[in-house]
Amino acid sequence: GEAVIPLLDAVISSAAERKLDEVCIGMPHRGRLNVLANVAGKPHGQIFQEFEGHYQENQVQGSGDVKYHLGTEGVFTAPSGATTKMYLAANPSHLEAVNPVLEGIVRAKQDKLNVKNAYSVMPILLHGDASFAGQGVNMETLQMGQLSGYRTGGTIHVVVNNQVGFTTSPKSSRTSRYSTDIAKMINAPVFHVNGDDPEACVRVARIAFEYRQAFNKDVVIDMICYRRRGHNEGDEPSFTQPQMYRLIDAKRTTRTLYAESLVGRGDISVEENDQISKEFQAELEAIYSAVHNVEPESPNWEIPKTAEANENQTSISADVVAKIAATQVAVPQGFSVHPKLLPQLQKRTEMIKDGTIDWGMGETITYGSLLIEGHPVRIAGQDARRGTFSHRHAVVIDRENGNEWTPLRALVNDESQFFVVDSLLSEYAAMGFEYGYSTIRPEALVIWEGQFGDFANGAQTVIDEFVSSALQKWGERSSIVLALPHGYEGQGPDHSSARIERYLQLCAEQNMTVVQPTTPAQFFHVMRWHIKNPARRPMVYFSPKSLLRLKAATSNIEDFTTGSFQKVIDDPTVVNASRVIFCSGRVYYDLLAEREKLLE
């Protein structure tokens, strides 16, 4: 499969010559060292040092993870001299899990450039044949390709098809004829090419790039090749594929075949071919022998040195609250708001006067205040625009013609500062996308919202492999917020628990923050604290359901204009207490109601 190197070189060279800003790659472990060295330009000495265990102070050591899971970034120079930035995402061993993460990274980079429909950051995803056909996250990621909230202008998919998945033959790993048939669901063109013909691979790569540029849609290259050795260093492949490996053992390498072709055409001599090989081998030997002379690591993969957040003053002025509230009733001329919704929007301006700011308005004040201060806000999830429980209404639909009105966009000059996205019905890829997005935009509040917290386990791979562990494994920081509706309120076992205990078990080494605010003002302060925290880390926020409309669960305007997040809210009405109960969320209001009932 080594022909993937000239294939990638051709794609990225084309991107550089077309003046694309950046090319971002997501790939598994197979061939990664080759890509790191020969495409991404990571120095051979640096790779040897990492395998020998020599690290500079503060350099990411990977927390025991394999060295080739680390990413890198740099500048790619084409043969013509044209250049483009290059980014290779860090990834776990879970095959294909990095795909939606990479798409989120690309979308964030495009949003930062903020040139509409330019798509000048290009994603490339590498796959194995068995995993491309077998892993459902591929279907989810392909489905994102033309959705407005996720579009990245077309991805070039390269399937390194070695015709085996560890020990599993194609007849056991897929029903379809080709491993790439999954791409038919989006009508993506698929180019099948012989991996033993590097020039054909380069030609196909250039065609795929032109297709992506012309149509801004996904395109797939199926590079048919083979795995010369086992799945890993200690594997014996002939146990399970004896006939295949009898053929492979007798087969000359791709390099040998191509060198013979060049010699046969008279492009190089036999002596020149041998000399090239010997010189490169000698160069590697010299670098390896000097491996203790540590080369500087890319600063992107150093453990970020950041101070912990202070108890920041997260309050805002009453004028800012009023300005945000005014957006909720500034209905565009000729816009027809649903008659049941209009009173709810009008009530939001009254709430700030009578001290009954509910959760929906508390959210609105939170997002509006961050927008005013220059922080982009991106909220994505199933039914996120209205809110699962019809409390948010961040985007209002004209009941006559279906036009959209996003009230909070009135606070910013650039509408790309505020995205509220109704996601596809996915957890895995949808959460992965937002995680990737958050790693690139530290200034933004990025929220993935579960329809119910119970459903977040559909994205457990993202939670385990990225959200909770990326900092320790790769030095990668994210400030994603997982908003998970939680509470047993009569809707059955699949609509009751966000499984708080699981996230608490995942907490270690200050890897993430877990919160369950009890009032709208507490939500406001903790989100503003989170976005101002220089020690960026993910947050898991257990959001309410019945509290969204509970009259007791409201806040006064003073709770937003003074103070900060309260770690403990005391009860000033009680003296000489004989028992103290620590609680949060709906439990507090249940206890409060019961106490009031007993006092009657």
Predicted regions span which residues?
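Conserved phosphate-handling catalytic cores of large alpha/beta enzymes
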Residues: 165-176, 184-220, 224-230, 238
